[in-house]
Structures are given as structure tokens and as C-alpha cells.
Regions:
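Membrane-topology segments of multi-pass transport proteins
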Residues: 1-42, 61, 65-204
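Transmembrane alpha-helices
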Residues: 49, 247, 301, 307-312, ...
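Interhelical loop and adjacent transmembrane-helix boundary motif
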Residues: 75-78, 82, 368, 373-414
């Protein structure tokens, strides 16, 4: 019996040692896997940091600027606090006027009033001149604060509640006034949302025009790129490579050079008009630049390779036996193409269309140079607010709306077609 117990103990000891070895081996494998993952993460860290610094953070900063309103609440804190009890009816009470006069004078003396005046002028036209005039006159007074009547004597416009409503509407640290303006809406003197005056309703129409032009450019690129991609995929390699170099040639040329070349071709005294006059096709020169036509033509030329390449890569992977099998079963060439070949190219169509549409909807330099006033897109208005009017909040709101619409379209595209079905390579 003791011999059997000794043998059993030996077996158990061996099993324990085997189990410990397996545990140690698993721990070593897990440690090795963690090292591999850490090494992979370290290799991708520069790329992640680059994307965050150049892509994610600028977008987040743009979205924050579109709603940031700390400038008013920090510059006029007592006035904003006193306006909380005002109900948009009649003149604000004396406490508001007293706080306002003291704070405006302090801003005028510290040279900070022009910045606030510019911000308020965005919300209500005429506020810049009103605030600067009020600041100058307050600096000449011997005693402060002043009364409601005295403020109205400085400028009679202070008797109009709409100017006080502008301050109350901007009382919070965050505001959606830029987004309302981007949708051609405004907050009136009673605190209600209403449409902008007709002469100031420009952004919604410009958004629709931008989407219409982007869709048109995408469809034209698809119609032109499909036969070119088909030819590339079915030619012998030697000829296909030569044609592919021609397709890629625009990428080796500056975008500015390609855009200005269309100015040379399309202008009234340009090459195309000269050929039309010489051939007798027309006796008058045709306006083909500084309009929507010029923008569409030049952008189709610039974006065409982005449609050709995804189509070509997908078509290259389609076996010709499918088409021949359909023909051998009695299908006409048209039926075989529509029911067999074209459905197989849908991933390439989706990838090319999505890429072309996203690029065209945010294009800036070509509409700016070729489009003129009638051929501009929403990107040109964003650039105007960033460079000329310096209204970064409005630029951020327009960019935010454009980003939102693109994300909605991307989501719808994913639900209908499926992002997993897109292909940019064979």
C-alpha cells in the first residue's frame, strides 16, 4: 500500500511540475505578445500624433470656436448678470445701465472695446459704431454710473430694445448664434428664432449650390472615368501602363498650375474662344470663366484621376470569364454588361464617387480662381470669414455644418452600400 501511495505522490508531483511549466510558458507567451503590441504601438505613435495635431485637434478647435462666446461674458460680466432678469420688454432697469456704463468705459480706456464692438456688430449691424461712440462720450463725463435717460441722450439707439437683446442673447459662455446665421436664421429682440432678412439669406442657397455642383462633378467624372478605366483594365500591359502614366501625369503637376491653365483656355481671349471664332462656330466670344461652367469643367479635370484609379483597380480584378460565360448562355453584350460586369464594379464606383464627392465639396483654390462670384462654393465663404472678415466663429459654424452633412451622407452611404464593400485596390 505504501508503495502505491509513493507512486501516486510521484505522479501528482510530475503533474504539478507540468502544470507549473505550462503556466510559466503561457505567462512568457503573454509577455512576448504584450511586447509585440507595445512595439507596434510605438511604431504607430508618430503617425497617431501627427494625425491628432494636424487633423483631429484643428477640427475640434474649429468646432469649439463656432460656439465659443466667452469674450462677451468675460468682458461685460456685471451687465450680463444684470440682464438675466430682463424680459426683452421695454428698457432694461437702472442696474443694467449702471453696470453697462462702468464696464464700457473701462473697456474703452483699456483699448479692449473695439474687439467687443466687432463681435457685437456681427450679431447686430451698427453695434460697432454705437459702442465706440458711447465709449468716447462716457470718457468725457465727470461722474459714473449714469441713468437710462442719460444713456439715451448719448445715443438715441439705446432706447431700442433690440440692441440690449443682442447682449442678452450672447450672455452665455456658449452660443449657437453662428449656426443660426449659417442657416439664415436669427434671434429677434423678443428672443424668438426667425429667418434673416431676405438680402442676408445667402448661406443656405450656397450650401445647396455646393452640393449640386459636387454631385454634378461626381456624375460627370463617373461617366468619363468608367470607359477609361475599362480600357486600362483590358488593354495589354504595355499599352495599359502607358495610358496609366498619362492618367497619373496630373499628380506630377501643381494644382495651381493646372487651375491657371484652365484660365488660359477658357478666358474670353483664350485658346478655346479663338478656335470657336476661327472655325465659324460662333461670331461672339462665349463667357466660359468666372462662372459655374468654368468651375465644373476645371474641377472635373482635376478630380477625374480620383475616379479612374478606384474603378481601374476593381476592374483589373474581374475575370473576363464571367462576361464570356454570360455571352455563351445567350445574353446580349448589353445585358451581360448590365447584369454581370457592372454589378461587379460597384465597389469601385462607390469608392470613386465617395472620394470625388468629398474632395469636390471642400474644394477652394479652383472655385476661387476660375469660378468668380457666380462659381464660388461654401469653402470660399469659409475662407472669406477666416481671412477677410476675421469672423472665425462663423467660419467654424459653416465648416461644422459642412462636416455634419458629409458625415450624414457617409452614414447613409454605409447603410445603403456598405463601407466594407468599397474597394480602392483589386
Amino acid at each position: 500500500m505504501s508503495r502505491e501511495l509513493t507512486a501516486l505522490d510521484s505522479v501528482l508531483e510530475i503533474e504539478r511540475q507540468v502544470h507549473e511549466q505550462e503556466t510559466n510558458l503561457k505567462a512568457q507567451l503573454q509577455k512576448a505578445e504584450r511586447r509585440k503590441k507595445l512595439r507596434s504601438i510605438m511604431l504607430t505613435t508618430p503617425l497617431v500624433c501627427f494625425i491628432l495635431l494636424t487633423f483631429a485637434f484643428p477640427i475640434l478647435d474649429m468646432l469649439f470656436r463656432s460656439v465659443d462666446n466667452r469674450e462677451i461674458s468675460q468682458s461685460l460680466p456685471q451687465t450680463i448678470q444684470a440682464l438675466e432678469s430682463w424680459d426683452y420688454q421695454g428698457q432694461p432697469h437702472q442696474e443694467v445701465i449702471e453696470a453697462f456704463s462702468v464696464e464700457v468705459l473701462a473697456l474703452y480706456q483699456s483699448k479692449e472695446l473695439p474687439k467687443i464692438a466687432n463681435r457685437m456688430n456681427i450679431e447686430e449691424s451698427g453695434m460697432r459704431s454705437l459702442l465706440m461712440k458711447t465709449g468716447r462720450k462716457l470718457s468725457r463725463l465727470t461722474s459714473l454710473p449714469i441713468s437710462v435717460t442719460q444713456l439715451a441722450k448719448l445715443d438715441k439707439r439705446w432706447a431700442n430694445p433690440k440692441y440690449w437683446a443682442a447682449f442678452k442673447n450672447l450672455s452665455g459662455a456658449l452660443t449657437f448664434s453662428h449656426y443660426l446665421a449659417a442657416l439664415d436664421l436669427q434671434v429677434n429682440e423678443f428672443g424668438d428664432i426667425e429667418p434673416q432678412p431676405e438680402k442676408r439669406q445667402i448661406y443656405v442657397d450656397l450650401f445647396f449650390k455646393t452640393f449640386w455642383m459636387s454631385i454634378s462633378i461626381t456624375l460627370i467624372c463617373l461617366v468619363m472615368a468608367y470607359p477609361v478605366a475599362y480600357l486600362l483594365a483590358n488593354l495589354p500591359d504595355k499599352r495599359a501602363n502607358l495610358l496609366l502614366i498619362i492618367v497619373l501625369l496630373p499628380f506630377w503637376t501643381s494644382l495651381l498650375v493646372r487651375t491657371t491653365s484652365w484660365i488660359v483656355l477658357l478666358q474670353n481671349q483664350g485658346v478655346i474662344n479663338d478656335l470657336l471664332i476661327w472655325s465659324g462656330f460662333t461670331s461672339e466670344r462665349i463667357q466660359m470663366i468666372h462662372n459655374t461652367f468654368g468651375t465644373v469643367v476645371s474641377m472635373v479635370h482635376i478630380l477625374l484621376p480620383f475616379m479612374i484609379l478606384p474603378l481601374y483597380s476593381v476592374m483589373k480584378g474581374i475575370s473576363p470569364t464571367y462576361f464570356r460565360a454570360a455571352r455563351s448562355l445567350g445574353a446580349t453584350p448589353f445585358i451581360a454588361f448590365m447584369k454581370i460586369y457592372m454589378p461587379l464594379t460597384l465597389p469601385g464606383i462607390g469608392a470613386g464617387a465617395l472620394l470625388t464627392f468629398i474632395l469636390s465639396i471642400g474644394f477652394y483654390i479652383t472655385p476661387a480662381l476660375v469660378g468668380g462670384r457666380s462659381g464660388q462654393m461654401i469653402s470660399n465663404m469659409i475662407a472669406y470669414h477666416m481671412q477677410t472678415s476675421l469672423n472665425w466663429g462663423m467660419a467654424g459654424a459653416l465648416g461644422g455644418l459642412l462636416l455634419f452633412v458629409v458625415l450624414v451622407l457617409f452614414y447613409m452611404f454605409n447603410r445603403v452600400v456598405g463601407i466594407n464593400n468599397l474597394k480602392v485596390g483589386g
